[in-house]
Each structure stands twice: as structure tokens, then as C-alpha cells.
Amino acid sequence: MDGTLFPGDDDLAIPATEFFSTKAAKNPETKREAIVKAYGDDNEETLKQRLTNLEKKITNITTKFEQIEKCCKRNDEVLFRLENHAETLRAAMISLAKKIDVQTGRHPYE
């Protein structure tokens, strides 16, 4: 079950290396120095560019999470108001039904 993506998918084990896009992640058994020599991806500008791209992605994700949080908070407020409105309507309908019963003579006035 260590190589599975989802619990219960033991028959469809997917190695985790298929989900990584870096060259180093696809060859985890080799040493980092050998990968750097083979692919030449360890110069300083490339690392800075990769870090900048990663920072942009993280910033984008955090702003999206903030937007989701605001949306969920707004939906929670709207749902709370709707629940209160439904409870008020229920109480008004019960009161109206009692009033109609008294006026039609079904139940005596209490």
C-alpha cells in the first residue's frame, strides 16, 4: 500500500514518480551530482528562475484560497439568514393556521 495513490486502490498502484515533473524526481535512485552533470540544471539563474516561478505559484494559490475563504464566509452568512427567514416563515404560517382555525370555529380561542 506504500506505492498506491489512494487507499483502497491496491490493485492500481501508481508510482509516485509519475506525478513529478522534475528530472531529479524521475530518477530518485541516482545521485544529485550525476543528474546535474547529465542535465545541467543546477546553474544559479535556473535555480533563481525556478524559485521565482514557485513563489508566483504559491502567491497565486494563497490569493485563491483567500478568495475561497471570503466566498465561503459570505455563503455562510447568506445561509444563516435564509435559515432564520425559513424559521420566521414557519412560525408565521403556524400562527396564521391557528388564527384561521379560531376564525372558522374549528378550535376555541385560547
From Swiss-Prot:
GO BP of this protein: fusion of virus membrane with host plasma membrane
Claim: Phosphoprotein is one of the keywords in the record: yes
Compartments in which it is found: Virion
InterPro entries: Chordopox_Fusion/A27
GO CC field: viral envelope
Domain of life: Viruses
Keywords of the record: Disulfide bond, Phosphoprotein, Virion
Function of the molecule: Structural protein involved in the envelopment of mature virion (MV) to form the wrapped virion (WV). The wrapping consists of the addition of Golgi membranes to the mature virion. Participates in mature virion (MV) movement within the infected cell. May play an indirect role in MV-cell fusion.
Family, per entry: Belongs to the orthopoxvirus OPG154 protein family.
Oligomeric and partner information: Homohexamers, covalently linked. Interacts with OPG144 and OPG153.
Protein name per its UniProtKB record: Protein OPG154
Gene name per UniProt: OPG154
